[in-house]
């Protein structure tokens, strides 16, 4: 019954972790572009 626990881990991963990584990478890209 591993699949029953999969959505409870997949939803927060996509809903919280992915946007945080996307915002961090975008922020670093903008900062690097302004400094260069």
Swiss-Prot record:
Q: What does this protein do?
A: May help in the organization of the PsaL subunit.
Indicate what this protein is called per its UniProt record: Photosystem I reaction center subunit VIII
Bilayer-crossing residues are: 10-30
Q: Name one GO cellular component term.
A: chloroplast thylakoid membrane
Topology with respect to the bilayer? Single-pass membrane protein
Asked if the record carries the keyword Ribosomal protein, the reply is: no
Q: Does the keyword Ribonucleoprotein apply?
A: no
A single GO BP:
photosynthesis
Q: Which HAMAP family match?
A: PSI_PsaI
Biological source species: Nephroselmis olivacea (Green alga)
Q: Which UniProt keywords apply?
A: Chloroplast, Membrane, Photosynthesis, Photosystem I, Plastid, Thylakoid, Transmembrane, Transmembrane helix
**Annotated InterPro entries:** PSI_PsaI, PSI_PsaI_sf
SUPFAM superfamilies, per database record: Subunit VIII of photosystem I reaction centre, PsaI
Q: Which family does it belong to?
A: Belongs to the PsaI family.
What subcellular locations does the record give? Plastid, Chloroplast thylakoid membrane
């Amino acid at each position: 019954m591993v699949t029953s626990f999969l959505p409870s881990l997949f939803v927060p991963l996509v809903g919280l972790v992915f946007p945080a990584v996307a915002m961090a990478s975008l922020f670093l890209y903008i900062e690097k572009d302004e400094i260069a």
